[in-house]
Structures are given as structure tokens and as C-alpha cells.
Amino acid sequence: METFLFTSESVNEGHPDKLCDQVSDAILDACLEQDPESKVACETCTKTNMVMVFGEITTKATVNYEKIVRDTCRGIGFTSPDVGLDADNCKVLVNIEQQSPDIAQGVHGHLTKKPEEIGAGDQGHMFGYATDETPELMPLTHVLATKLGAKLTEVRKNKTCPWLRPDGKTQVTVEYRNEGGAMVPIRVHTVLISTQHDETVTNEQIAQDLKEHVIKPVIPAQYLDDQTIFHLNPSGRFVIGGPHGDAGLTGRKIIIDTYGGWGAHGGGAFSGKDPTKVDRSGAYIVRQAAKSVVASGLARRCLVQVSYAIGVAEPLSVFVDTFKTGKIPDKDILALIKENFDFRPGMIAINLDLKRGGNFRYQKTAALGHLGRDDPDFTWETVKILKPKA
């Protein structure tokens, strides 16, 4: 039996790039909560003792940017210089301007266009992917890496492992076989966890706790065997972390945000962007399309691409590939997708309820992946059952 290895990684909410994603999306939430027509393009960067937010925001909302930055950092666990950032005493820099009137006129006609007329906020191409290898219809490598990261955060915050600090990374290698184009996981080959910790804990304790409280509860026993390799804090020590250890920037973790290296990626980041930005809304609708194809039993694996021109509502192209796993020809699946999904940005925003912010709606997406999540706020995960014409 011919097999191959594939690897996906994830990072925790305390990773500096992910901190920035969460700040950008917390600001988006605050704007949309008060003004659903807010136009937001918010970037964040961070380094030792400093967080800066910058970009273009046009909104009727009254937003205290500094408070949002501090609250977000505090919520993650950055409460002292020792852990990498002190939310209450760090410098917060804000440089926000209005959306360019040229873009505003071309995309939404200064808010005068009807939803079906609203153009894409920029050019670009986005991909959606789904695979039947997990209940989430997501790649197992990505699901496990992400769940390990979520468990690390959980056992840090509930004090099961009080030595943990917010920053951390995970990586999982799975051995697969290709079954006529479908991906079948056989076993977990390697588990890698690098987590920030305090000065008191020994490397032995770290390895023991990670195996007991993080790996065992997350990775199903059927995938682990005596050949599975564990690299637990392989660099030795990881005391200095967060923005003190590395600079952070919004939009640096786009593969972690999506499919862990499976499928494809058009290059556009998600966080800090309102739904007129097709980098985000386009990627969400094609995930819904690909997931619906697999959930409807039309294919075991599916990739969907959509592309846009700035200011133009209708997509330039829609593409489907089922990797030879389709029950009907790909051209028929493409026709079904076009009949059942409206790819115009204004209609995506309505159909997926993307103008609704607040209550951490977008901030939740900014750590632990935007896709494959079981949460009613992740409207793009709702399956539409697609039925081929008789």
C-alpha cells in the first residue's frame, strides 16, 4: 500500500501574529455592531511593549480603539511584561484614516448601490475546500493541529497547567493513502508542540503535561501507535514569547486560517476586513460551496475557486475540481454550484449575515481557524444540500 506524509501547523491566540488578527477583528466587530455598513480595513502590528493599529475605516460607529486593543490583549492573557506584553501599560498607537473616496465610489457608490450591484472591494481569487476525512469536512492534519492549540489555551486558562504562557505553536504530520483521489488518514506520524512557559517548570514536566493534558484528550487513540514521534518543546526553553519574542502582524497566518496547506490559497488575508472585501467574503462562500458538494455526497473531495475585479459585482470565473472523486461530472457540479450560490459580494453579505458584528463574532474567527468550526456565527459552515437534476 503506497502512503505519503502531509503536515499542517497551527499557532495559539498568544502568538504575536494571531494577537494582531484578533485586535483587527475586535475593531471590525465594534464598528459593525454599531454600523453594519462600516467599511473596515484594519491592520495591527506589535513588538515589545507596543501595539499599533492602522488602516482605513469609514463608519458612523464611535469606537475607542485603544480600549479595544487593551481589552483584547488582556483577554488573551498578556497581563505583564514577563509573559510578553502588559495590556494595561503598553504603548498603543492609532493611525486610522477614511476609506479612499475612489474605492468608495467604485465599490458601493458611497453607499448608494443596491446589494446586488455592490462591486468587489478589490480584485483577487479565493479558494474553498472540503474533504470527507473528518466530520468537519476538513483535513485531519489541520483539525488536529488546531485542536491541540485550542487545548493548550484551555489548560492554560483553567490552570490545569499553570506554567503555560500565551504563546505557542503546534504541528501534526499524518500518514495518508490516496483512495481514488480521496484522502484516507492512516495514523499520526509526528506531533510537535512548542509552547511558551514560565521559568519554574522543567522540560520533563512540560513533556509529561503536554502528553497527558493536551495530546491524549485531542488525538484519537486509533491514530497513535508506538511509532508516533513526539517533539515537545524541542528547542529546549521558551520563556520569552508573545510580542517580546517576535514582532506580530495581521494577515501572516493565512494557511492556519484556512486548510493547513491543503486545497489552495489566493493569498488574501481575512482579519480586519468588512464583507465588501472579497478576500474574506469570497473565501467564506466558496468554503460553503465546497462543503455542500461533499456533504451532499456529490464528491469525497472538492476545491472551488472564484475570482473578482474591483468594482464589478459578478465574479469573473468559478472553477471546480473534485480530484476524480465526483459522483457526477465536474461540469455538472459547477452548474449546481452556480444555481445555488450567489457570488456577488453584496449578496454574500446578506446570505451569510456578514454585516453582523459584535459579541466576538469576528474576533472568534481570528484564532483557531475560520473554517470547519461548529458555531452558529460561522454561517458559511451551513450546508446546502445539492441535488443533481434527474
Curated annotation (Swiss-Prot):
Cofactor-binding details, from the entry: Binds 2 divalent ions per subunit. The metal ions interact primarily with the substrate. Can utilize magnesium, manganese or cobalt (in vitro).
This protein's UniProt keywords: ATP-binding, Cobalt, Cytoplasm, Magnesium, Manganese, Metal-binding, Nucleotide-binding, One-carbon metabolism, Potassium, Transferase
Cellular component terms per the entry's GO annotation: cytoplasm
Thermal activity profile: Optimum temperature is 37-45 degrees Celsius.
One Gene Ontology molecular-function label: metal ion binding
Sequence similarity: Belongs to the AdoMet synthase family.
Reported function: Catalyzes the formation of S-adenosylmethionine from methionine and ATP. The reaction comprises two steps that are both catalyzed by the same enzyme: formation of S-adenosylmethionine (AdoMet) and triphosphate, and subsequent hydrolysis of the triphosphate.
Name of the molecule in the record: S-adenosylmethionine synthase 3
Organism, as annotated: Catharanthus roseus
